[in-house]
Amino acid sequence: MHKILLFLFAVLIANILPTFAEEQYVDPVFGDTIDRTDEDFVTVSLLVADPGAASYSVFGHACLRMQCPAFDMDYCFSYESESVKNRIGDYLAGNLKMGLFAVPVKDYCDGYREEGRGVYEYKLNLPSEAEQNLWRILDEHVAKGSILPYDYFKRGCAITCVQFVEEALGDTRIQYDASLLQREATSKEIVLNHCNRFPWSGFAFAFLAAGESEQLVSGAEQLCVPAELVQAWKKASINGVPLLAQEPVLLVEGVPQWDDSWFTPMLLAWLILCLAIANIFWNKPYCDWLMLLAQTVVGAAMMYLICFSNLCCTSWNWLLIPFNPLPAIFWYWRKYWALPYACVMMGWCLAMATNLLWGHVMVGWSHILLVLAWSLIVLKQSPWVCTLLSHKK
């Protein structure tokens, strides 16, 4: 009886196994059993790191995470520039290059963990074909290396995530919320709005960026900051399917960072303005010379950026009008031009303040106060003002 049962079992197995073998999937191109059409073959996520205290990290960082469990691959594709830490001169000259780098996710997260910055993951709902196209596109950019000039607005971490995903989608388009499509803003305004926690970075940024960054941008072109990208993609969809698949997952726990110094650009500007007002009555020459020296140093830097630097968005800057070396060059003849020059500076302050009140950011209030202080220093050099003050005494 046992032999009969064993025989029947063997016959059953012999008939079942070929059936399984026939039904097993074999890839027609690669000849393996991995189904590359499966929706989970490749998964794509957006990784966003919290802002850091360093001036080059105050906006945070965004990159794309690509995973392929079948081949045990898990990489972050991060668009970055060459290190700025020890190359400030090259940065100001516009000589730094940018490129796409593939970094293992563990190494990427460990770097931010050491800095105390949080990292969040947002899984993307992309078509399977687009996910594989995206990986191919990213690999091609990695192979090119760091060959493109540094340009935060056109090749920053956030905007390149948008560009790569759009290229992978081909003819399919991301449908953005109407609030983004209807908003009018410049790249400079968008960036400065995210500098509230780091006032000194925002203060310096206004000196560095102008020109093209002060032109209105629309739609996805406004997504030049990681925080803006996340908010836009939360409301975006592809063919009616939400672009972000789920709530964010915390990969690295961090501590919120900000500049908590009590000495802010606004405080500095008020102190200098009060000093300029007081010096109208004190009439101390060393105050005039100190202000002239500071104005000349900043003006020379502005002239260098606009005339000689290849740094992006430095073709023109409205701060060049009050900050330039011309007053120092013609200081000996100041009695002839002091009054009209001071009037022009005050007109500049009025125009910039009006822009701010209307919501169009070109400079900050601290810059306006500094220019107002400088205009008072120059105004005091006018013979007409000197005569008026001497009569009052």
Give short role names for the model-derived ranges.
Residues 25-43:
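Short, Gly/Pro- and small/polar-rich lid/capping loops
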Residues 14-18:
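N-terminal signal peptide c-region/cleavage motif recognized by signal peptidases
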Residues 52-53, 117-125, 143-152:
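Second-shell loop/turn segments in exported
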Residues 39-116:
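Glycine-rich catalytic cores of cysteine/serine-nucleophile enzymes that process amide/ester linkages
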Residues 140-393:
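Activation targets extended, charge/polar-rich intrinsically disordered C-terminal tails
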Residues 4-13:
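Sec-dependent N-terminal signal peptides
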Residues 19-23:
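Boundary at the C-terminal end of the N-terminal hydrophobic targeting segment
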Residues 1-4, 392-393:
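Positively charged n-region of N-terminal signal peptides that target proteins for export
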